[in-house]
């Protein structure tokens, strides 16, 4: 085997190693996990809303916006529309 044969062999070994590494990672992540009793107790008796479809709305303060109205205060021209 010349230089090309060794390079091809190293490439095949590296590719197989990568495939094995990915398969081990997939199998480790798909293994069923058993929740600990502490996590179940905390979830059950936390008193919070555990609804997965609950959407919290962002609270926007009422009143003038000082960040975006900085230039309007210093200049005496009306804002462009």
Curated annotation (Swiss-Prot):
Bias-annotated ranges (Basic and acidic residues): 67-81
Residues that carry a glycan: 64
Region (Disordered): 57-81
UniProt entry tagged with the keyword DNA damage: no
A biological-process GO annotation: maintenance of root meristem identity
UniProt key word Glycoprotein: yes
GO MF annotation: an example: receptor serine/threonine kinase binding
Top-rank taxon: Eukaryota
Record's GO cellular component terms: apoplast
PANTHER family: CLAVATA3/ESR (CLE)-RELATED PROTEIN 26, CLAVATA3_ESR (CLE)-RELATED PROTEIN 25
Protein name: CLAVATA3/ESR (CLE)-related protein 25
High-level lineage: Eukaryota, Viridiplantae, Streptophyta, Embryophyta, Tracheophyta
Gene: CLE25
